[in-house]
Design a protein with these regions (language model features):
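Periplasmic-binding protein-like
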Residues: 160, 219-224
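Generic hydrophobic/aromatic pocket-lining and core-packing "Φ" positions
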Residues: 159-160, 209, 230, 264
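Terminal low-complexity tails and localization/encapsulation signals of metabolic enzymes
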Residues: 1-29, 62, 66, 114-143, ...
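Conserved small-residue-rich beta-alpha loop and adjacent elements
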Residues: 119-195
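ALDH superfamily catalytic-core signature
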Residues: 228-292
Length: 292
C-alpha cells in the first residue's frame, strides 16, 4: 500500500515489509518515510487544520457517521486485515473492527456536542448582571502515534475525536501494522473528509516519530505504547499538549468471598486475549494464601 501525504497516495523506493506473524509471509509493503515526507505532511496538515476548523460540527458529524457506516459494511474485510497483519485470531479481528465502528460513530456524535461554558461574573465588584463565556476551539495539527496491538481501533481512538473537534491529524501507525490505518484513511476520504484533513505516514518510529513530536507545527500529540517511548516523547514535545496511554502492570485482586470459577475464567480471558498483548491484560493476581 502507499502512504497518504499532502493529498496524494505516494510510494517510495525504500520499503518496509509487512509480515503475517503466523508464518512470516509478506502481506504487503509500505513506503519508508523520511524527513522530507514529514515536512510535506506537516505543511499540508497546517493548511488542513484551517479547513477542518471551518467545518461546522454538523459537517464533521456527517463525515464521521458516513465513515462508520462504510466501516460497518466492510467489517469482515477489516477484521481479516487486522488478523493478518497483527496476528490475533479472526474472532478478535472481527471484534476489533466492530469496536472501531463504535469508536468512530461515538466521535461523530460528540462533534455535535462541543460547547463552552457560561460563567456568572457577580463574584467580583461590578460583575452583577454580567456573564462571561468560554468556547472550545481546535488545537490545530494533532500527531497520532499508535501501537501494533490494536491497529485499527486505537487509531480510531485518536483520529475520531481529533477530527470531531475540528483538527487535522497526522497519523503515524506502528511500523509492524500500518495497513489498517491506511485503510481507515481511505475510508475517511471516501466519506468526504477534506484531503488535507488527514495524513498517514509509514516508517520507522525512531526516524520520523521524533521529527513529528519536536516540530512546532504540531500542537498536540496522542500516543499509545510503552512507558519508555512515552517519556521520550514528553521530553521532545516541549510545551505541546500530550495524551499518553502507556503500558501498565495490571493486577487482579481476588477477595476471600470471590466466585473462583468466575475469577478463573476472567483471568484466563484477560490474560491470554491477543496473546497477552493488551495494555490492561491481567499480569498479576493478588490474593490470600488460602485462595492461592
Amino acid at each position: 500500500m502507499k502512504m497518504y501525504v499532502a493529498g496524494q497516495w505516494i510510494d517510495k523506493p525504500r520499503k518496509i515489509e509487512v509480515l503475517n506473524p503466523y508464518d512470516s509471509s509478506v502481506i504487503d509493503t509500505v513506503p519508508k518515510a523520511d524527513a522530507a515526507d514529514v515536512d510535506r505532511a506537516l505543511a499540508s496538515a497546517e493548511r488542513g487544520a484551517k479547513v477542518m476548523a471551518r467545518l461546522a460540527g454538523y459537517e464533521r458529524w456527517k463525515i464521521l457517521k458516513k465513515a462508520a457506516e462504510l466501516m460497518a459494511e466492510r467489517n469482515e474485510a477489516l477484521g481479516q486485515l487486522i488478523s493478518r497483519e497483527e496476528g490475533k485470531i479472526i474472532a478478535e479481528g472481527r471484534f476489533e473492527a466492530s469496536r472501531a465502528v463504535e469508536t468512530i460513530m461515538g466521535s461523530a456524535e460528540e462533534a455535535k456536542r462541543i460547547h463552552g461554558e457560561t460563567v456568572p461574573l457577580d463574584g467580583a465588584p461590578g460583575g452583577v448582571g454580567k456573564l462571561g463565556f468560554t468556547l472550545r476551539v481546535p488545537c490545530g495539527v494533532v500527531a497520532a502515534i499508535s501501537p501494533f496491538n490494536f491497529p485499527l481501533n486505537l487509531v480510531c481512538h485518536k483520529v475520531g475525536p481529533a477530527l470531531a473537534a475540528g483538527n487535522a491529524v497526522v497519523v503515524k501507525p506502528a511500523t509492524d501494522t500500518p495497513l489498517s490505518a491506511l485503510r481507515l484513511t481511505e475510508i475517511l476520504l471516501e466519506a468526504g473528509l477534506p484531503p488535507e484533513g488527514i495524513q498517514c505516514l509509514t516508517g520507522s518510529g525512531g526516524e520520523i516519530g521524533d521529527l513529528l513530536c519536536a516540530d512546532r507545527r504540531v500542537r498536540k500529540i496522542t500516543f499509545t505504547g510503552s512507558r519508555d517511548v512515552g517519556e521520550r516523547i514528553c521530553r521532545v514535545a516541549g510545551l505541546k499538549k500530550v495524551t499518553m496511554e502507556l503500558g501498565s502492570n495490571s493486577p487482579v485482586i481476588v477477595m476471600p468471598d470471590a466466585d473462583l470459577d468466575t475469577v478463573a475464567a476472567a483471568v484466563a480471558a484477560t490474560g491470554y486475549a491477543n496473546a497477552g498483548q493488551v495494555c490492561i491484560s491481567t499480569q498479576r493476581v493478588l490474593t490470600t494464601g488460602k485462595i492461592y
